[in-house]
Amino acid sequence: MFQNHKSEILLATPLIKDDAIFTKSVIYLCQNDRHGAMGLIINKPLSDTLRDVFEELEISHHNTFNEILDYPLYMGGPISPHKIMILHTTNGRNYSSTIKLDEGLAITASMDILEDLANNILPEYFLPVVGYSCWTADQLTDEIKSNDWIVTNKLSKKILFNHENKVKWQNHIEHAGYTLQSLDSLFKNIGNC
């Protein structure tokens, strides 16, 4: 039976291991319907920064704050690894390719938001990602039933957009009501069934 998880968080369980992309991933689901799902991994920073993007796209950044220039890009997933998108809070600005999500969030994949960032015009929260993750019609439902993912609707923008990436997965696990010990115990028992 289909269940819509749009605007919810997927947390990789300990059953996903030895996977360079999805082990301990935190994924914000941007879209989920009967045709499939699309989400962004939000806790896997890359070595590239917004400075690299501005230089590659020849966006003027001479007056850009250093904290913006040094902002890391995140690997959103394995699909379209060169597509740059910004997950952000809505800020009243109209960009040419914004898709509004729930909880005051949006995703934009156009040059105008990058130009705003280079000009220090910032949404309250934002996260630049390259690539995305997607699932076919029943694939995500099957993976959830197989206990690959914990789904939580307990969205905290503060946790979602913070840069403590090494503990972001753990912070989301705890925000969802689990401890690492209870999670390990639960999945050891599942593995023994």
From Swiss-Prot:
GO cellular component: cytosol
InterPro entries: AlgH-like
Highest taxon above the source species: Bacteria
Family the UniProt entry places it in: Belongs to the UPF0301 (AlgH) family.
Record protein name field: UPF0301 protein Fphi_1754
Organism, as annotated: Francisella philomiragia subsp. philomiragia (strain ATCC 25017 / CCUG 19701 / FSC 153 / O#319-036)
